[in-house]
């Protein structure tokens, strides 16, 4: 239970409970408008981050999953307190459970922002084979290129000190309420500087760790607890949403 996936599922459940009789269109939007002042760095595990971005895109529409070439679908989206940022359609795993648990959804997509300098570095990494996940022989031993790359890139945990700007992550939802079409946008903006001042970590780590703590707290209190395996959107969203406002991630 991080932010996405995690909070975005709770956001969707909250919208379904309080603002819609039927959710039809869901766009999860993730913008990091921060600057870590490094030539190239990832905000979490580089191996996972690069593999996530370079895989084929995937979204849900009219009852079926549709694939796209990596980062081939993009458009500018406007983010609160940030402005327009080019946003790229990607596959993100929460779409799988959200379309199952809210079967009225006609289309569900996930968007993430990237700067051109980041994408240029990413293309170079791919073109020279450093994003490969298969072992290669080097000096008589096997190494995995992307794991070697991880070892030489900046540690995501060390980015916080000089990080400026903020993240903006949320759900843009369209559907029906009382027979009328309605839209609803629920989001959080998190300052990298404020996150570092409070915890010594940058905003991406903060927005991942705080929701995990809230989920664990609700589980230990028995608020979110029932037999079986459940996704976050299958629990009552209200206690979680209340905790977000109290624990540093207001919406």
Mark where each language-model region is:
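Conserved A3 ("GATE") glycine/threonine-rich loop of ANL adenylate-forming enzymes
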Residues: 3-5, 33
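Rossmann-fold dehydrogenase core element
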Residues: 1-2, 23
């Amino acid at each position: 239970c991080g932010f996405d996936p995690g909070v975005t599922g709770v956001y969707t459940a909250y919208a379904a409970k309080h603002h819609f009789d039927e959710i039809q269109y869901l766009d999860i939007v993730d913008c990091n408008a921060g600057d870590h002042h490094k030539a190239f760095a990832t905000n979490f595990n580089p191996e996972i981050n690069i593999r996530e971005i370079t895989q084929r895109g995937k979204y849900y529409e009219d009852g079926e999953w549709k694939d796209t070439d990596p980062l081939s679908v993009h458009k500018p989206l406007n983010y609160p307190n940030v402005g327009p940022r080019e946003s790229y359609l990607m596959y993100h795993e929460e779409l799988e459970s959200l379309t199952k648990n809210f079967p009225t959804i006609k289309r569900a997509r996930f968007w993430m922002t990237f700067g051109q300098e980041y994408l240029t570095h990413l293309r170079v990494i791919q073109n020279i084979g450093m994003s490969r996940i298969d072992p290669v022989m080097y000096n008589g031993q096997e190494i995995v290129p992307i794991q070697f790359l991880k070892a030489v890139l900046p540690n995501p945990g060390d980015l916080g000190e000089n990080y400026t700007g903020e993240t903006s992550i949320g759900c843009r939802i369209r559907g029906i309420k009382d027979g009328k079409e309605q839209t609803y946008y629920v989001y959080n903006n998190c300052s990298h500087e404020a996150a570092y001042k409070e915890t010594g970590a940058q905003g991406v780590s903060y927005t991942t760790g705080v929701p995990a703590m809230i989920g664990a707290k609700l589980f230990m209190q028995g608020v979110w607890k029932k037999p079986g395996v459940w996704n976050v959107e299958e629990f009552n969203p209200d206690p979680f949403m209340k905790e977000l406002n109290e624990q540093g991630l207001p919406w």
